[in-house]
Amino acid sequence: MSGKIQLLVAFLLTSACLIYCTKYVTVFYGVPVWKNASIPLFCATKNRDTWGTIQCLPDNDDYQEIPLNVTEAFDAWDNIVTEQAVEDVWNLFETSIKPCVKLTPLCVTMNCNASTESAVATTSPSGPDMINDTDPCIQLNNCSGLREEDMVECQFNMTGLELDKKKQYSETWYSKDVVCESDNSTDRKRCYMNHCNTSVITESCDKHYWDAMRFRYCAPPGFVLLRCNDTNYSGFEPNCSKVVASTCTRMMETQPSTWLGFNGTRAENRTYIYWHGRDNRTIISLNKYYNLTILCRRPENKTVVPITLMSGRRFHSQKIINKKPRQAWCRFKGEWREAMQEVKQTLVKHPRYKGTNDTNKINFTAPEKDSDPEVAYMWTNCRGEFLYCNMTWFLNWVENKTGQQHNYVPCHIEQIINTWHKVGKNVYLPPREGELSCESTVTSIIANIDVDGDNRTNITFSAEVAELYRLELGDYKLVEVTPIGFAPTAEKRYSSAPGRHKRGVLVLGFLGFLTTAGAAMGAASLTLSAQSRTLFRGIVQQQQQLLDVVKRQQEMLRLTVWGTKNLQARVTAIEKYLADQARLNSWGCAFRQVCHTTVPWVNDTLTPEWNNMTWQEWEHKIRFLEANISESLEQAQIQQEKNMYELQKLNSWDVFGNWFDLTSWIKYIQYGVMIVVGIVALRIVIYVVQMLSRLRKGYRPVFSSPPGYIQQIHIHKDWEQPDREETEEDVGNDVGSRSWPWPIEYIHFLIRLLIRLLTRLYNSCRDLLSRLYLILQPLRDWLRLKAAYLQYGCEWIQEAFQALARVTRETLTSAGRSLWGALGRIGRGILAVPRRIRQGAEIALL
């Protein structure tokens, strides 16, 4: 008996587990989950009057940041935001400065004299090594060490206005713009332009300024920018714990330069270093406390005069009216030595640094002089002109080295510029006339950290212009919000159509649904309705803003990179939302926040911790299952639609009028016709087989016409009286064996064959059913036995419950009676107190 009870209990537990322990896939829409993205960003700015930012969105500084309780990886170098910034700034720079593109080589031999620089010019005039704003040499442009530009006077012959005659030209050039053959025998040399292998300007080009442009990047709807808010972030952090989400970045500076970064937006009251995760490339943000600035100036003593080579063609040379022009120069202001010392101290504390801790053995050094000019010299742009500054005096000053020290450096303006983003050269117009000056705040240093074998460290200035924008935006990363999530639950989809309930409208920001990113999955799931509506409302709002901008500036879309980016951002957002809704619709979950399905969960060992796990962590664990889950959901939805279609067809018979609809019976009529055609075809096959078998035995076909017809099956009839015209002799013996006509005989033959066929089918079905009965009889007995066990177990459980109820009832009754008696005695005792007092008083008085 105990074995039966154990079997019954095991059966009940197994059934309950199969019913209640099965998990089904549940689709959640609006979960705070994201993945890395690489789509174009668009810009927003306050100053939309400049040429490069006229198509940006108007910036109102209303970009809130939502703190997220998550951990995320950040890398300033492997970053789509910084890569887009580098590409876009280069395109704006290239288009704004406008290098001339109509170029023709001009390689003529010129006879040039030696340098016109006098001995007085080569010796530095006396004066202080350090200058300030009140020093008189600033206005006179004759500070100690500055000199005139090296010039050469050249003559060359070219065809002039008269094409059949040569004309001699005499021009003055910068000595750095010509290459001469080494010949010490005479004072005159054979020289060529140093860009003879490149090109020179043959037509007039417009001269443009490089406008100071500041803008911020914004993500399209459906995408978010995450920022690492950790103060110890150094450009590469696999586990940043202080993450905030925003739709736009901070303002970024676009001025390109080498060695130093100007007017950056990341300067703080501290020095910090962004270090590449795999090599020694760094970008150092300087402490703004030291007020580091640079003031560049070109004296007003140059005049550019074009040379007319032939009719309709002009060559813009460096035609110098003043044969001894002063150099351009840049002056550094601020506490540079203290700032550089703080850089060394910050480097020593950096976790990536492996060199010496002695700051006296850490030096700022310049790159090799045989490098490109942009590498060997500090290169920057001042009012559209490209300055190349020799930083030797500056390095001697900040390092207090032996040699000439100044807080200013000489510079030179060039026309042939190596491109900083792509391999190539651009040729620009000569400098404009008049004095040029520009002042910038120095906010960063581009450098490589080189640790030597003799326990010394060199901070070598670098020409990686792209590092400036990695410092500006390196703490951001672009992610795509994927609001669709899967999780196992015990609820199974109910197949009837769900009713739609009206909900109140919640006005939240676009990033409102991300506020639950760090919360547990269970808590986040409670707000999915509001989150999904917030997501959609934010997409629509940003779409409208983008559309307004595109409409206002549709005539200028061809001018900058922003026009196409605005259009692409709008299209991307619409495509993303439609793609999400298409996926939900393919699973039967369109416009639902929580959608239960009939698909079983594929991995019972993989279940979420609803109270301790975030949706982002859960998505990382099940990412490898998403493809299979999506396919299973689609198959389940297809099967569901088929079932609903068949059910709707059956429901059509509920209406009595549909029974008289001929279209409802056409299918069954077709089935009947097909059955008749099948029987006829089967009979034809049987007849052909029998005919062939009889031909093999020597019989003729039964349908042979007389007199070839031979009666095979005789139908005997009774004897008849002969006619009066006939005699008995005429009748003969044929009267007793008269046969039916052959068509009737053939019909009888077919009937007998059909009866034989039906009999055989009946016998076969009877044998099959009998064998099936014999096979299923043991199963029936086994099921009957198990049913008896189950019935006995149910009766036993019922009796146990009845006994338990009876005992409980008796116990409660007895307890109630006892309690009632106790309460009665207590009540009677309380009521007897006055009587006892009276009796006691009477006894005392007696």
From Swiss-Prot:
Transmembrane segments: 672-692
Region Fusion peptide: start-end pairs: 504-524
Disulfide pattern: 43-56, 100-205, 107-196, 112-154, 218-248, 228-240, 296-330, 382-438, 389-411
Record region (MPER): 649-670
Annotated stretches, region: Immunosuppression: 567-583
Protein's UniProt name: Envelope glycoprotein gp160
Motif range (YXXV motif): 699-702
Comment field (misc): Some HIV-2 isolates have been described that can infect cells independently of CD4, using CXCR4 as primary receptor. These isolates may have an exposed coreceptor binding site.
Region called V3, residue ranges: 296-329
Residues covered by region (V5): 454-461
Superkingdom of origin organism: Viruses
Entry text on domains: Some of the most genetically diverse regions of the viral genome are present in Env. They are called variable regions 1 through 5 (V1 through V5). Coreceptor usage of gp120 is determined mainly by the primary structure of the third variable region (V3) in the outer domain of gp120. Binding to CCR5 involves a region adjacent in addition to V3. The 17 amino acids long immunosuppressive region is present in many retroviral envelope proteins. Synthetic peptides derived from this relatively conserved sequence inhibit immune function in vitro and in vivo.
Extracellular side, ranges: 22-671
Signal peptide: 1-21
Keyword Transmembrane helix found: yes
